[in-house]
């Protein structure tokens, strides 16, 4: 059932971009502004982004999902190409990953840092550096969102 809901949320044709961020955030109890901050950092909101890392791995889509997750994606019926062609899938999968890191580290900034730097104890400094950058972006995006909501 959970897989069906995940698929449904990712592929409903009328699902607008704003709804995609909000739905992913609601499903995993993550502020949509935080997801947007990560997307801004990871890809500059480029839904077609593909990047090769120093270790040879690749990151795909607006949320730069690493090919480390390829096996898991295939088990769920997805591919790396779908992360590009269906940006909402990328957003939902990223929210799912971030939620898993929050289960490991608690609902704090080290979990956000793990999204990029991973969970190795040796990567704590990198996690915190990434999290600081995301925090600044998050504050700006959240403030812009509040400002836009006041204009309505």
Curated annotation (Swiss-Prot):
InterPro entries attached to this UniProt entry: Lysozyme-like_dom_sf, Transglycosylase_SLT_dom_1
Classification via Pfam families: SLT
Family statement drawn from the similarity comment of this UniProt entry: Belongs to the IagB/IpgF/P19 family.
Record keywords, A-Z: Plasmid, Signal, Virulence
Name recorded for this polypeptide: Protein IpgF
Superkingdom of origin organism: Bacteria
Signal peptide range: 1-17
Organism expressing this protein natively: Shigella flexneri
């Amino acid at each position: 059932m959970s897989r069906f809901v995940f698929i449904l949320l990712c592929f409903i044709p009328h699902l607008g971009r704003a709804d995609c961020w909000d739905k992913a955030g609601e499903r995993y109890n993550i502020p949509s502004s935080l997801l947007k901050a990560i997307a801004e950092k990871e890809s500059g909101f480029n839904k077609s982004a593909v990047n090769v890392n120093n270790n040879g791995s690749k990151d795909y889509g607006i949320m730069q999902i690493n090919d480390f997750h390829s096996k898991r994606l295939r088990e769920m019926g997805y591919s790396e190409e779908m992360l590009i062609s269906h940006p909402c899938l990328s957003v939902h999968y990223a929210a799912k990953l971030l939620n898993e890191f929050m289960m490991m580290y608690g609902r704090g900034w080290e979990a956000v840092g793990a999204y990029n730097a991973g969970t190795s104890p040796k990567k704590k400094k990198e996690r915190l550096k990434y999290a600081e950058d995301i925090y600044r972006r998050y504050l700006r995006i959240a403030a812009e969102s509040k400002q836009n909501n006041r204009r309505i």
